[in-house]
Amino acid sequence: VPVLEVNSELADAAFGSAPERAAVGLPTAAGARESWLRAVALGGVGHYAAARAELARARRATADPALLSLTHGTEGSLLRQLGWHTHAAVVDGRAAALVLPAAVGRTPAPAATPAEILHAEAVCDALTGLAADALGTLRPALAARLLNRCRKYLDIHLPDAGSAWRPRVRLHWVSAETALSAPGSGLISVPSADRSADPALAHAEAAVVLAENSPSLRHRVKSRLLLAAASAASGDLDRSRALATEVDRDCRDHELLPLRWACGMLRSGVEPTGDGAEVAAACARLLATRGGRLRSASEVLGRP
């Protein structure tokens, strides 16, 4: 993520080693990009209402299409975390509309300037966001097409996996989720030469490798959570339980409440005698006080 000329504490809380800082207080944003970073950090610890307010501030403070797109993509992520995929698709559509038309006519060459890099990351965020929304509305084939488009764009415009770790990690996340939602469909190819590998496991493991070499603790934790889910789906419950226990501890220590809720839900399935269900319920109650309304199956809880 290009974070030049922004407060380093905000950057570290959003995409670095100290996401828990957002739970105790963050510096005031000096501009639209810092407001976006504040929103990302606040969303990571489950302060949804505060994150949405910060996204609104960011949108009022900029006319840059790429940054505006990122604010909409972040709002889509917040909605998806709570189960509101249909609503998320609307704001992710706005994110895509802000950057995709310009991307169509762009010269097929690596992004070179900070502005070009930001635009390319916004394109990838919009495409992976829409793919995740498609999964949540039971359209895995659409998700796979969007992921393929993102992969091709990423390979051309952000070819350096080291500097473009975040869009690549996200691509592996949603690829793994798509493979999990449509097992045996062949919609998702494995990201390696071993074509016999389980695509969900392979993408989850690839995300872990990339995230472990990134500065973002939150991305490392989420990648291990996804690997725990993929391991459970493949029948390796021991590995899943071990990973989920590790993830729960990290979420607790670093105030990653949304991920701890998701981990609790997984743990309630792979270890029914444990405290996963209780932890998930407690997290859901706390998220609700922070503006995070989880969608029920019948949507009786209302709108997000």
PLM feature spans:
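C-terminal non-catalytic interaction modules
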Residues: 1-28, 238, 242-304
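Intrinsically disordered, low-complexity segments enriched in Gly and acidic/Ser/Thr residues
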Residues: 212-254
